[in-house]
Design a protein with these regions (language model features):
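Polytopic transmembrane helical bundles with strong interfacial aromatic enrichment
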Residues: 1-332
Length: 332
């Protein structure tokens, strides 16, 4: 299990770096740095580094190759240790690592399709969402291997109410991240609003671009307000809720607050477009923290249901039927 844990952490770090670099590719307009050539760049695996957009795009592809190797290694090690508790079988690290490998291969193929389509906004957003899926599956493997609070979630107790609230946070987070990717790629959307917190429309861009940024902002605010409510609920019910879930909620809320600060500074200080990569990096942190919150809350709720059922069965009473809401969506 220790080897799986180490490789999952390494894969998670590489995935985060790859996603941040992908944001730099989009923001710098380097997505077509190799033209419509894929997987090679103008017929070369190692082309002459004569242009900056080519360097950025090729570096992004190299990072993708490293990520594939890291995830494949994680799968192989998990398969070798599949007999250990928590690795093989339902809810084990092996299944989630296989999901991560499938997602990363799909992301690689979709990246090639995106290049062939000339980096169309819809294809870029689809690629971005698949990349978020890769991150989620690697995070699932990391948690199942005992890191990021995975071990504590099996021994602490919590409610399905907290799990449902965490699911909503994760859903809002992925929607906000998707709209963030569209805002960065759609012509004029990134500069559609010139003021904060309200949107002072930029007269030089089309209304659709402004609407995209307004929707992105609205989702971000809804996520922040929801996480405030989640933290308040968990603090009020701290005697019956898992500390690891409260800690994860605090981290997610802190990431959202940081993101709102970064976004406001970008607009008010008229920061250069390259600094939008920091905004995207924080967005990745938001998705990772919200997904971890949802998965940990689900894991805690399921462990609590199992413990209650075992206690009732030991006393000879009827075993309560588990509710569907407490079943983790990522366990397979």
């Amino acid at each position: 299990m220790r080897a799986v844990r180490r490789l999952s952490i390494a894969a998670l770090v590489v995935a985060c770096l790859h996603l941040v670099f992908g944001a730099i590719v989009r923001i710098s307009g380097s997505g077509m740095g190799c033209g419509d050539n894929w997987p090679k760049c103008y017929g070369y695996w190692f082309p002459p580094f004569s242009r900056m957009d080519l360097v950025v795009e090729v570096s992004h592809r190299y990072l993708a190759s490293i990520l594939v190797i890291a995830v494949a290694s994680m799968v192989l090690v998990a398969f070798r240790h599949r007999a250990e508790p928590g690795v093989g079988g339902r809810g084990g690290a092996l299944r989630s690592s296989l999901g991560a490998l499938g997602a990363v291969l799909l992301a690689a193929v979709l990246g090639g399709v995106t290049v062939k389509l000339g980096n169309a906004p819809w294809a870029t957003v689809a690629h971005w969402l698949v990349a978020m899926t890769v991150l989620a599956m690697i995070a699932t493997t990391t948690i199942r291997s005992g890191t990021l609070g995975g071990t504590a979630a099996l021994v602490q107790r919590g409610s399905s109410r907290a799990a449902r609230a965490a699911y909503v946070a994760a859903a809002l987070a992925i929607l906000a991240v998707a709209l963030g990717g569209l805002t960065a790629k759609f012509p004029g959307a990134a500069v559609g609003c010139t003021t904060v917190p309200l949107c002072g429309p930029n007269p030089s861009v089309v209304p659709s671009s402004i609407h995209i940024q307004i929707t992105h902002r609205t989702l971000a605010v809804l996520l922040a307000l929801h996480l405030v409510g989640v933290v308040m609920m968990l603090r009020k019910r701290r005697s019956t809720e898992a500390p690891i879930v409260l800690r994860a909620a605090w981290i997610a809320l802190a990431m959202v607050i940081l993101q709102l600060g970064v976004a406001s500074a970008m607009i008010l200080l008229h920061m250069r477009p390259v600094y939008r990569s920091l905004h995207e990096a924080t967005g990745i942190g938001i998705w990772l923290s919200c997904f971890a919150l949802a998965y940990l809350a689900s894991r805690v709720a399921r462990a609590s249901e199992t413990a209650v059922a075992a206690t009732v069965a030991a006393r000879g009473g009827p075993v309560p039927v588990q509710r569907a809401a407490t079943t983790p969506v990522t366990d397979s």
